[in-house]
């Protein structure tokens, strides 16, 4: 059960950067290496995007199974308003409709700001890049999650998400390769 919950949280985290219909990033392409802690589990991730975020995929590697410490590998691919999640170890893929359209920070409208109660709360430097720091709320299925995100050119470089007073995800970019081919 814990593994399913962990995978669901990771999938939702991945979808926050996987909606690919409009340009959402201020650079053409990049490869971002990320480290996350989700419900106590360490996760290594790599995010790839091209065409200003219209094409996007990510890969996650995590250890699950308690004492067994089994390594799990997940790949997600954005496909319009759908996301394809591939368990590379089990050789199984699932396609799902995104539950909530992720926020496009390059094109924040008043409607989106109001819907998610988005507030700009300052700036901070991450990996030598000046990020705008935002707080927001996402309500899905009667559950509210609260996030603080650090955005550089539309790209989330850091994210802290909590629910019911507990931090459930912290994620931060550790390396950025801009204009990757």
Task: Locate each region found by the language model.
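N-terminal secretory signal peptides that target proteins for export/translocation
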Residues: 1-2
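Sec-dependent N-terminal signal peptides
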Residues: 5-14
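Sec/Tat signal peptide C-region and signal peptidase I cleavage site
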Residues: 15-20
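Extended soluble regions of mature proteins
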Residues: 22-181
